[in-house]
């Protein structure tokens, strides 16, 4: 049998995936969504680690480059990749764009696996509804729900093969007309009816949309596989305002939550100092919940 020769690209991918698989700890981990807007990915990852966090979430600005380029930038920083974003056009009115969104999600699921990430984050659409109301046959919302479920069902095989969780993220009504609450995401997941589809519970959006975050997560926390954190309507770092995360954390603990707690916010002052304070605050709130 001839020996298999592996390229440098293959070594990077295989090594990164193996390291990630062997070094995923049990219990919650703390992450940050791409701090320092003008910094390089490496600088951001190093900042996250200096502030005491376990990893970094990657937005779309980093994902149009080869996986090995991302791995090279993160090499030696000690920062894990918690999640990456997926498409935002699964509910576009153009069927060509919807098909392209499904294909992009397939690519992102593979990329997430190569980077050792746990999840791909999906916001189906931003902005107002653009579909026609087809009543009495079907309302515009029912059209959207059926299209979204159909699009997600096309990804069930990819989710199963990669082992990556596809997250549905409910956003507040100022950002999207569709899927604003945890219950709505849960309904979509139930309609898809396949493992590997879960919700992202964003405390910033929930502050604006849910009457009681603790009660909401007591009911729907079983769907939660990832968490975003920020304080108040200005979306500042946790601990900058007197916001109590403990009721929500307590509900998540009852469901056995052991995923990422990721800060997605601005900073009230020096980013490293602000993130350090936020981490101390979140660890204290989690332990007290």
Q: Could you tell me what each predicted segment is?
A:
Residues 36-38, 62, 87-90, 126-128, ...:
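Active-site-proximal loop/turn and secondary-structure-junction residues that shape catalytic pockets
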Residues 2-6, 10-30, 38-49, 116-118, ...:
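Histidine-acidic metal/acid-base catalytic patches
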Residues 47-65, 85-90, 96, 100:
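N-terminal substrate-binding region of glycoside hydrolase catalytic domains
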Residues 31-32, 55-59, 168-169, 200-202, ...:
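Short catalytic-loop micro-motif centered on adjacent basic/acidic residues
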Residues 64-73:
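Active-site-adjacent beta->alpha loops and helix N-cap segments on the catalytic face
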